[in-house]
Amino acid sequence: MSGLESSLHHASEELPGDVQTTFRRRSIYESSEEEEGSSLSFPANSLAGSLTASDDDGLEEKRHIEYNLPPDGGYGWLVVACSFLLEFFAEGPISAFGVFQEYYVNERFKGHTSNATISLVGVLNGSCMAILGVVSGKLCERYGYRIVPMCGIILLSLGYLLASFASEPWHLLLTQGVLCGVGTALTFMPALVVPAQWFDRRRGLATGIVNMGIGVGGIVWTQFNHMLIRKISVAWTLRLTSVVVLVACTLSLMLIKTHQVTAAPRKVGWQALNDRRLVLFMCGSFFTGVSSLVPFYYLPGYARDIGVSEGGGALIASMANAASLTGRLVATAVSDYFGPIVILLCAYFLTSTSILLVWTTTHGFAGTMAFGIVFGLGYGATFTQTSALIAKLFGVDALPVFVGLYYTLAGVGYLFGPPVAGVILEKTKSWGSPYLALKLYTGVPMVVACIAIILVKLSTKKRLAA
């Protein structure tokens, strides 16, 4: 049974007890007078559900729902390519914020700000994007996947433009932080949801390719920002980013079209929170958010403090992003074979062990580079599986709401993660190993997230066995 058919049968379990469901492939709606034994040929690209129920008068009524199975290719691949570009230009710069942070703290606002304060800029960007995920999903459901993201692209571009004129740290909090974060929140939903509508058997591959846009973007934007800040100043770097984001994201969005899976999509209500798997999965997203951005924000500064050159620090950050891309590639290639839960568990194992066993025991360039690579591999694989796993566990109709909820809770984690790490770093500077507490603070939440996903897998096995 395919993933979509499993989702349909899962949805049928939520119908009233007096409703029996049967699912079979057909080309058109059948009339209610047609007998069950009619001989028809059904093409492979449509699936219909026949619902039989008894009303109060004891009369039998048939209701029919037609499901258009995803084509698993065709125009869907163009949707994947454009979604990749949307992720690259809208979310890629978030992974590259460490370069801006180092410049703001050590040059532009030197002596007038701290790591903890400036890290709030990147945190507000990432957390606003994520926390507003549910709102973005609901808005896209109501107004479509064209109008809402276009508003987001305009806000995102405007945020970078206004940030270029910032003369105080709090100006950056409002522009590069909040405004860019809100813009990204409204922009990224089509890239996460729409490709999954076009694929069933290859859904893991398709969504994985899309999510690689962040990893590729992190690599390119890190080097791009580092080079341009030195050549044309941070202000003109931000202005150029504003123009590039506006043009590239708009062109990509114009080619992203939705594929309606059902004639009447199932509405997802808050009663879904009664599902233990959903609660555990969302808890995992929160703790992932707490940990995941800290290394990207603090690796350049950490490298400088242990004697690595400025260029070496940027290289470590770039290699971490390159490893993130590799992790996304590997996870994407094997996702449909091993399944998203197994891939997610492997990703959490890599991130946890890299922080607690590698980063905590190294104090040189080579060891830090090794940590960045191993952590990047695990981190990259983590976020490739979100859409595929939600579709597998809860159905395609749940994607807008549950993907939004996932990123909302991850955003709350983002909001706490790097700023608290900055405070910890400031308080432990007098220690013999000032970064040790920060490393432990980064590693423990990732272990908790790993445990949550293990429990999701066990709960899924128990549910299937029941």
Where are the regions a protein language model picked out?
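Intracellular juxtamembrane helix-capping segments at the cytosolic ends
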Residues: Y104, G177, T184-F199, A206-T207, ...
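Extracytoplasmic gate region of multi-pass secondary transporters
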Residues: F89-Y104, T222, D275-V342, S387, ...
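C-terminal ends and interior cores of transmembrane alpha-helices
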Residues: I154-S167, L253, F349-H363
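Helix-to-loop junctions at the C-terminal end of transmembrane segments
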Residues: I131-Y145, I229, G327-P340, V358, ...
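Hydrophobic core of transmembrane alpha-helices in multi-pass small-molecule transporters
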Residues: C82-F84, F88-F89, L156-Y160, P169-P190, ...
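Intrinsically disordered, low-complexity terminal tails of fungal membrane proteins
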Residues: M1-G73, L458-A466
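Conserved MFS/SLC helix-loop-helix module at the cytosolic interface between two early adjacent transmembrane helices
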Residues: I131-H171, S335
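C-terminal transmembrane helical hairpin of 12-TM major facilitator-type secondary transporters
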Residues: I306-V308, G312, S318-S324, L329-L393, ...
